[in-house]
From Swiss-Prot:
Pathway: Cell wall biogenesis; peptidoglycan biosynthesis. It is found in: Cell membrane. One of its GO terms (cellular component) is plasma membrane. The lineage of its organism: Bacteria, Bacillati, Actinomycetota, Actinomycetes, Mycobacteriales. This is D-alanyl-D-alanine carboxypeptidase DacB1. It comes from Mycobacterium tuberculosis (strain ATCC 25618 / H37Rv). The chain crosses the membrane at residues 375-395. Residues 1-32 form the signal peptide.
Length: 405
C-alpha cells in the first residue's frame, strides 16, 4: 500500500507539471501606478492628433507586470544608481534613460527605466531585426508610390527604383528612412502582418512595455515602449554582425531611381563621429516622442550602451547627453549593477541568420517560453507521465498478487 501511495503522489506531481496546474501565472494591474511614477501605465499626453485612430477607440494601455522586469530596483522612476556610485550626469534632459553592458546585460544606472514613452525612430531596430532574421539580404525590392508618400524622413525609395534588402536596411538605420521602413514592411507580409511580426519579436525579447503601431516609429494609436525595452532590443541587435556593421557605417552608396541618380548616404548619428570607440546607434524624433537616442561604445573591451527617451536638445544635443552617460558608465567599476537585461526567448535562437554569433541562453530564459509554445510541451509531458504512472501501477498490482512465502 505504501508503494501504491507513492505511485499516486508521483501521478499527481507529473500531472501538475505537465499541465501547469498549481503553477503561478503572471498577472498585472493596468491601472495601478504610484503618483510618483506618472508614466508607469501610459505614455505622456500627446501634443498633436497623430495617435487618434481613424475609427473606434484607441487601444488600452498594456498590462503592467506585477514585478519589474529585470529586477525590483528597476521599478523606481527617479534616477537609480548603485550604492556608493557617483551621481549621474546632471545635463541629461531625457525623462527616461538607461546605461547597460552590451555583453553581460548588467544595467549600471537608469532613470524611470520602465516608464512608458513613445520611441520615435529608435523602434526601427525591430523592423531591422525582423528583416535580418527572415529575409535574404540580396533580395530585390521594387519601390512603390506608397513608400515615397510616407510622412517624415526619407532616403529616396520610389517607383522605378529597385533596392536590395541590404540597401534598404542601410537607409533605415543610417538615415532613418521611413520609406525604407515601409518597403521592408511589405516584404514582411504587408502592414498588418509586419506589425504582428514586429510585436511578436518585441514580446519574445521580453518587452512588456512595448506596442508598435507603425514600422517607422511615427506616432500611432497605442504606441509605447520604455528605456528598458529598447535596451533589450538593441542588446539583441548588436549581437548580430549585419546590424552591428550597418549602424557603424559612416557612408553608403544608395541607389537612385528613374532620372534621380544614386547618392552617398551619410549616417546621421553624431556619436559615431565624435565619441572614441563609438559603435553607432540610432536617432529619433517626433512631436509626441520628443528626442530619442540609442548609442554604444567600446572602451578597452568593455561595451556599453545608453538609451534616452522623451528628451530635448537642451542643454546639449541628445548624442552629447548619451556621451556623458557612456562616460559615467565607463567610470563605474566593472560589475556595477542595479538590474539585468533579461535574455530573449530561446525560440529566437533557431531563427538567427548568423549562427556563429548567437546569444547565450541562461536557465531563466527557458522559463519565458510563451503559453502557445509551451502548450504542446505540457501536453506531451502529461501523456508520457501518464504512461509511466500506468506502468508503475501495473507493476505494483502484479507484486501484490504474488504468493507470500
Amino acid at each position: 500500500m505504501a508503494f501504491l501511495r507513492s505511485v499516486s503522489c508521483l501521478a499527481a506531481a507529473v500531472f501538475a507539471v505537465g499541465t501547469g496546474i498549481g503553477l503561478p501565472t503572471a498577472a498585472g494591474e493596468p491601472n495601478a501606478a504610484p503618483a510618483a511614477c506618472p508614466y508607469k501605465v501610459s505614455t505622456p499626453p500627446a501634443v498633436d492628433s497623430s495617435e487618434v485612430p481613424a475609427a473606434g477607440e484607441p487601444p488600452l494601455p498594456l498590462v503592467v507586470p506585477p514585478t519589474p522586469v529585470g529586477g525590483n530596483a528597476l521599478g523606481g522612476c527617479g534616477i537609480i544608481t548603485a550604492p556608493g556610485s557617483a551621481p549621474a550626469p546632471g545635463d541629461v534632459s531625457a525623462e527616461a534613460w538607461l546605461v547597460a553592458d552590451l555583453d553581460s546585460g548588467a544595467v549600471i544606472a537608469a532613470r524611470d527605466p520602465h516608464g512608458r514613452h513613445r520611441p520615435a525612430s529608435v523602434i526601427k531596430v525591430l523592423v531591422a531585426m525582423a528583416s535580418i532574421n527572415t529575409l535574404t539580404l540580396n533580395k530585390s525590392v521594387a519601390g512603390t508610390a506608397d513608400d515615397a508618400a510616407v510622412e517624415g524622413t526619407k532616403v529616396g525609395v520610389n517607383t522605378g527604383g529597385t533596392y536590395t534588402v541590404n540597401q534598404l536596411l542601410h537607409g533605415l538605420l543610417m538615415h532613418s528612412g521611413n520609406d525604407a521602413a515601409y518597403a521592408l514592411a511589405r516584404q514582411l507580409g504587408g502592414m498588418p502582418a509586419a506589425l504582428e511580426k514586429i510585436n511578436l519579436l518585441a514580446a519574445k525579447l521580453g518587452g512588456r512595455d512595448t506596442r508598435v503601431a507603425t514600422p517607422s516609429g511615427l506616432d500611432g494609436p497605442g504606441m509605447s515602449t520604455s528605456a528598458y525595452d529598447i535596451g533589450l532590443f538593441y542588446r539583441y541587435a548588436w549581437q548580430n554582425p549585419v546590424f552591428a556593421d550597418i549602424v557603424a557605417t559612416r557612408t553608403f552608396d544608395f541607389p537612385g531611381h528613374g532620372d534621380h541618380p544614386g547618392y552617398e548616404l551619410e549616417n546621421d548619428n553624431q556619436l559615431l563621429y565624435n565619441y572614441p570607440g563609438a559603435l553607432g546607434g540610432k536617432t529619433g524624433y517626433t512631436d509626441d516622442a520628443g528626442q530619442t537616442f540609442v548609442g554604444a561604445a567600446n572602451r578597452d573591451g568593455r561595451r556599453l550602451m545608453t538609451v534616452l527617451l522623451h528628451g530635448t536638445r537642451q542643454p546639449i544635443p541628445p548624442w552629447e547627453q548619451a556621451a556623458h552617460l557612456l562616460d559615467y558608465g565607463f567610470n563605474t567599476p566593472a560589475g556595477t549593477q542595479i538590474g539585468t537585461l533579461i535574455e530573449p526567448d530561446p525560440s529566437l535562437m533557431s531563427t538567427d541568420r548568423n549562427p556563429a554569433d548567437r546569444q547565450r541562453v541562461d536557465p531563466q530564459a527557458a522559463a519565458r517560453i510563451s503559453a502557445a509554445d509551451a502548450l504542446p510541451v505540457r501536453v506531451g509531458v502529461a501523456v508520457i507521465g501518464a504512461l509511466i504512472v500506468f506502468g508503475l501501477i501495473m507493476v505494483a498490482r502484479a507484486m501484490n498478487r504474488r504468493p507470500q512465502h
